[in-house]
Amino acid sequence: MFPMKKSLLLLFFFGPISLSFCDQERGADEEENGGEVTEQEVKRNILSSIVNGINRALSFFG
């Protein structure tokens, strides 16, 4: 039970950090594209941040 709680804690810790990086990348993309962000880019950034958070949590235990 403890390892599961620890992994969830790490996931919730690294998730917001990844999302903040995603927001920074989105801001840079907005500057390049003249302020336009497509729905596809938003979904891609969110999905990549989730995957990065999971990978960081798994690499911590591996």
Curated annotation (Swiss-Prot):
<keyword id="KW-0964">Secreted</keyword>
<feature type="propeptide">
    <location>
        <begin position="23"/>
        <end position="44"/>
    </location>
</feature>
<dbReference type="InterPro" id="IPR004275">
    <property type="entry name" value="Frog_antimicrobial_propeptide"/>
</dbReference>
<comment type="similarity">
    <text>Belongs to the frog skin active peptide (FSAP) family. Amolopin subfamily.</text>
</comment>
<comment type="function">
    <text>Antimicrobial peptide with activity against Gram-positive bacteria. Has been tested against S.aureus (MIC=37.5 ug/mL), against B.pumilus (MIC=75.0 ug/mL), B.cereus (no activity detected). Does not show activity against Gram-negative bacteria (E.coli, B.dysenteriae, A.calcoaceticus, P.aeruginosa) and fungi (C.albicans). Does not show hemolytic activity against rabbit erythrocytes.</text>
</comment>
<keyword id="KW-0044">Antibiotic</keyword>
<keyword id="KW-0732">Signal</keyword>
<dbReference type="GO" id="GO:0042742">
    <property type="term" value="P:defense response to bacterium"/>
</dbReference>
<dbReference type="GO" id="GO:0045087">
    <property type="term" value="P:innate immune response"/>
</dbReference>
<keyword id="KW-0391">Immunity</keyword>
<dbReference type="Pfam" id="PF03032">
    <property type="entry name" value="FSAP_sig_propep"/>
</dbReference>
<dbReference type="GO" id="GO:0005576">
    <property type="term" value="C:extracellular region"/>
</dbReference>
<feature type="signal peptide">
    <location>
        <begin position="1"/>
        <end position="22"/>
    </location>
</feature>
<keyword id="KW-0399">Innate immunity</keyword>
<protein>
    <recommendedName>
        <fullName>Amolopin-P1</fullName>
    </recommendedName>
</protein>
<keyword id="KW-0165">Cleavage on pair of basic residues</keyword>
<keyword id="KW-0878">Amphibian defense peptide</keyword>
<keyword id="KW-0929">Antimicrobial</keyword>
